[in-house]
Amino acid sequence: MRLWTMSLADTTEAHTNEHFPSLALGSNKKSTEGKRSPGAGGQSQNSQASNGSVDYSRSQCSCTSLTSHYDYSEDFLSDCSETAVRRLQSEKPLAKAKEKRKYNAGKLPQPRGQKDIPAEKKQFWNASLISSQIQTIAKRRDTMTHRILSARLHKIKELKNELADVHRKLEASAIENQFLKQLQLRHLKAIGKYVNSQNNLPQITAKHQNEVKNLRQLLRKSQEKERAVSRKLRETDGELLRTKDVLQALQRLSEDKNLAEREELTDRLTDLTAKMEANDKKIQNLEKQLRLNNRSYSRQLAKENRKTLAAQTATKTLQAEVRQLQQKLKEKDRELEIKNIYTNRILKNLNDKEDYPKVSSTKSVQADRKSLPSVNMRHQETQKSDVPFWITKGKRGKGNIAHKEKSTETNHDIPYYVCKLPKQEESKRKYEANLTVLKSMPSPPASWGLVATEQICAFHLECHSCTHTADLSKEVEHRKPQTSLETPRRPKENKEDQEKRAIPAEAEPTAKESEAHKDAEDKALTRAAGNAGDAGDAGDAGNDREVVGEHKVVGAQEVVGAQELPGADEADEVHGAGEAPRDVEPGRGRRKTPRKHYSFTEATENLHHGLPTSCRQVSGSPHCRCRHDMGKHRSEQELRLEPAGYEPSFGKGAGARARARARATAFRDRKSSLMEELFGAGFAGRAGSSDSEAVSKSPQTGPQASAGNAFGDSRATVAGSIQASPTEANRKTVV
């Protein structure tokens, strides 16, 4: 019995120690405590067992509360604790009673005279007590351990199940984590590749461009090779065709039975080669000749181009001067309209008359009602500017002409006004109408006589000059190429001076005779002076004024002589007595002479009073003679005009005509040489024939005065003709 209980206890202890180490520790402690204190072993063991169970329940509850959903140990421990409490409450008084009994038994005094109890009996008694106690304890433990073991096994199974679930979940999570890591690595690799591709993009593009360049170079090389091969193929094809042709020709020759012998063929071949060489030499010579001709023609063309350019520049400058002169003419017309009051009144009276013939107004006929002052002024300006352009321009650079003398291109103005002249019949009708009007007009005051004389004289001269417009226009047309082509020939002035010196010696004595003749006429007029008024004195005061003329030659400056220029008094009358001439150079004063008083005829007095008179009487007046002297170069230009019925004489001597003839011949020779040099001998012959005809006609006509000084506005005149040589224009007179 004891052994069984011990074995049971040992087994229970072993089971409890396996599953619950805390209980094993508690039991070991209890056993040790029981051995130490065997008297109080039962109580202590019970109390310790109960405490151990309670502690186990607490620890088990604390351990399993986190893992298990259903905690069976709590119910089990609660029941166990209630039973244990009840047992302890029931066993406490029993234990206390036993202890008291033992204590009382130990304290009871043994009788002194009694014998002690033997030890064997004491041991037997103790063993019986211990066995009884063990039995009770074993019973109690059987029920408790059975319950505890069942609950613990159930709990262990549940925990194992949960552990297996947790292991499965852990394995699944580990597998999933592994897959996620692999996926992350793949993603990282892809991202790295993308970033690297972005960073290496310029390198990739550069590589691509290099590849493209290389491919293009290869393509170009391949194309060049293909072209070369195709070229070679074409060449070979051509050679093949040529060889085939040669082969066919040779076959035909070999098949030809009428072929000559070899010697004859060689002779023919040598002849043909010699001919070919000769032809080649001829071709080379012709090519050389062609090159030489081209060079010569190119040089000639360059010369002609230079000439044409010079002519164009000359024409442009002349046109500019013409425009300036036209502007000056307009200004002079305005001045005349303002100052010539008497002429305006005459025009108004002419407009009021009904019997005045209605004729179309022109710019060059002074009988026109509206353009009388302007036309006279234009002819006056042409008289002032009849010197060629290239002469005046060269002299202007040397400083021997005043700055106001700009009359250089009137050669272009001449055809402009001459082309608009009316016919002879119209001029005659106008002349007759004007005579009738003048006869019917009342006599004006004496102070207006000079102006009327000038107007009527200019009108008569213009009526006669209108009949010869054709010859004058031809002369001006022949003069234009000379004016345009003389500009680039300034270096030849020395030759021109020699030509000037080559003028016949008859000119000088004739000039002296003409001057003596003029002096004689002036003295005769002084003897006939008697009834002239203050107007006559003022009108003829300019006849005594002498102007120093400078004869300027290229390379020398010498004063050669002086000439008289009458007619300056009209300019002083028009612009006022106190106004000095504009073109007088500073430092060159006038040679003052005492005034001469003249007497006039009845015709001149009638003209002073505004009455009409015959043309002979008018022309014999000193005013008309002065007009003739101032417009001498204009009259020399008009020497070529054909004779007409109206020929006023101004007393020009034979010396003046001889001098004009000499100048005309010199000019004609110079002109013919220039024309022959420029345009050939044929053109020069035609020009010479036309000039000779004009000169042959010129002696038949009397000297014609120009209408340019009709209103007395000229301040400086040129003492040479426009038909003279270019060096003749070097002689100038300054007022």
Swiss-Prot record:
Bias type Basic and acidic residues, positions: 487-525, 542-553, 573-588, 632-641
Biased composition range(s): Low complexity: 43-53, 528-541
Protein name in UniProt: Lebercilin-like protein
Name of the encoding gene: Lca5l
Renumbered residue ranges of the record's region Disordered: 12-54, 91-115, 356-379, 473-597, 632-657, 685-735
Pfam families attached to this UniProt entry: Lebercilin (PF15619)
Bias (Polar residues): 689-707
Residue ranges that the Swiss-Prot or TrEMBL entry lists as coiled coil: 205-335
Family: Belongs to the LCA5 family.
Organism name: Mus musculus (Mouse)
Alphabetical UniProt keywords: Coiled coil
